[in-house]
Amino acid sequence: MSGGSRIQLLSPRLTNQIAAGEVVERPASVAKELLENSLDSGARRIDVEVEQGGVKLLRVRDDGSGISADDLPLALARHATSKIRELEDLEGVLSLGFRGEALASISSVARLTLTSRTASASEAWQVETEGRDMTPRVQPAAHPVGTSVEVRDLFFNTPARRKFLKAEKTEFDHLQEVIRRLALARFDVAFHLRHNGKSILSLHEAHDETARARRVGAICGGGFMEQALPIDVERNGLRLWGWVGLPTFSRSQADLQYFFVNGRAVRDKLVAHAVRQAYRDVLFNGRHPTFVLFLELEPNGVDVNVHPTKHEVRFREGRSVHDFLYGTLHRALADVRPEDHLASAPAAAAEITRPTGQQAGEFGPQGEMRLASPVLEQPQVPQHSISNGGSGAGYQYQYTPRPSQPLPAAEAQAVYREFYKPLNDDAAGPATLPQSQGDIPPLGYALAQLKGIYILAENAAGLVLVDMHAAHERIMYERLKVAMASEGLSGQPLLVPESLALSQREADCAEEHAQWFQRLGFELQRLGPETLAIRQIPALLKQAEANRLVQDVLADLMEYGTSDRIQAHLNELLGTMACHGAVRANRRLAIPEMNALLRDMENTERSGQCNHGRPTWTQMGLDDLDKLFLRGR
């Protein structure tokens, strides 16, 4: 510090402008603060008008409770709020805002006009400020019950901040994303957005499941809703509900991930880790899951006052929340079966043919198709009923899959060897298919094999195409995981124990979780305050870098209270075994073998994706086929 410098108080205008650096980053930041105030006021309709991406004009109008004339000047003062009174109030705060600094920060870097009227007032009142002039001017105005906030010329008095703004389209995209997030958080509020005089978004109140799904589709796209699983699970004071996208609807960027805690949009590391773990086995490298999820818990179980923008939260029982999120999502993804995608069939469903025989149908080298023969039975499809809309959604079939049983390790290894050896064409027996005419399995009955790669099958909805290698790879992988779980992990003692230098905190963590490491095949011994010895590692991971793996696991344990790194390494090895053991392309399968593969798919968790996240099968309904041939036009 210079000897001539003296300590002095900063002016209110300067302190507000400094604070604005945390609160007001761009027009989207302003929109977030104003919209949250509107929602906290009990608004049921919010209109947003924007010009030039929000830099020239951002106007937010609501029909909330309004602000009285006496409180208007105070509303623009820093740290003035109606939402908390004592420090203890923060433990149970449910409002989106509570610090009372947003309007003061915004008014210090823009020209702000606030007009409001309460239900008990006969007229509205208006207050204006212009950046440098921090003395508010209050005057009567015409306005319905509610509040309008108009922000013009953002950063007009701070040119350095204005230079960091992006192009108009970029700024508007950020602003629009803020509105989308809040519209997902509050289905009971209508949102309307206009940009440069053009209507961009119009969302009406959504009070039932259908309307909520329609709003999610309008914001996230119809493709998401078509590929999303609805979930709603409540346990031990925690409730998780919303929609999770199927792994086949993953994206190259994490731009379709919305997570809300008690109605507040958050981006939390613990939440992200739990979701990533749940999708671990079904996503291709570099792909990101999609979801719109809502977590509800007691307000005192989460601290929302840990980040200037309130994007991050801290859970009181972080480990319990993590395990609940992971377990719920993991189970939801694992329970997806083919029949979940086939809740209805087309109205013009044809008869299903059950071919049996020693040789599969296939396409020959010249492209001609050789059908399996002989065709012994043609069970009749049960009569379907047309729904009110005439779409054929009333068609129902009955099929009860056999219960899935844990596979002993010996059997899993036998299956691995059986599918890895060349096929003996004479060994295939007759197909074992349901005898009841009404028992049409979700994936139907195999018809033929295409180019030694795909299985063509017919079900109640139409045509099913199966990538036989990808499907069998998933089946083998799940069986090997079950086998490992039942047999446990054998350890490989090291001839020369490896020494590992750590911080004292990491060494304490390793000692605390010693039994957990032992169950996974590791034996760790503490040699000193900051030294560990690795005496044993899992036999399957003998080629892994033990030191680095243990350090990474300890980092996870200290951050999240759990780690999936060891299991991820093991699963990677099992996935390689399953890939090598799965039926190969250009291998001819008999009809009974193809049908056996279809039945195994119906009874295997996550069978819709291979180990790398690629789809294993797809459905083409009769409507899809009709469109290809222009039928019905």
UniProtKB/Swiss-Prot annotation:
Transmembrane segments: none
UniProt xrefs under InterPro entries: DNA_mismatch_repair_CS, DNA_mismatch_repair_MutL, DNA_mismatch_S5_2-like, HATPase_C_sf, MutL/Mlh/PMS, MutL/Mlh/Pms-like, MutL_C, MutL_C_dimsub
Keywords: DNA damage, DNA repair
Gene Ontology process terms (BP): mismatch repair
Source superkingdom: Bacteria
Gene3D superfamilies: 3.30.230.10, Histidine kinase-like ATPase, C-terminal domain, MutL, C-terminal domain, dimerisation subdomain, MutL, C-terminal domain, regulatory subdomain
Alphabetized GO MF terms: ATP binding; ATP hydrolysis activity; ATP-dependent DNA damage sensor activity; mismatched DNA binding
Gene Ontology CC terms: mismatch repair complex
Alphabetical list of Pfam families matching this protein: DNA_mis_repair, HATPase_c_3, MutL_C
Keyword DNA damage included in the entry's annotation: yes
Job of this protein: This protein is involved in the repair of mismatches in DNA. It is required for dam-dependent methyl-directed DNA mismatch repair. May act as a 'molecular matchmaker', a protein that promotes the formation of a stable complex between two or more DNA-binding proteins in an ATP-dependent manner without itself being part of a final effector complex.
Similarity comment text for this entry: Belongs to the DNA mismatch repair MutL/HexB family.
Name assigned to this protein: DNA mismatch repair protein MutL
Lineage: Bacteria, Pseudomonadati, Pseudomonadota, Gammaproteobacteria, Pseudomonadales
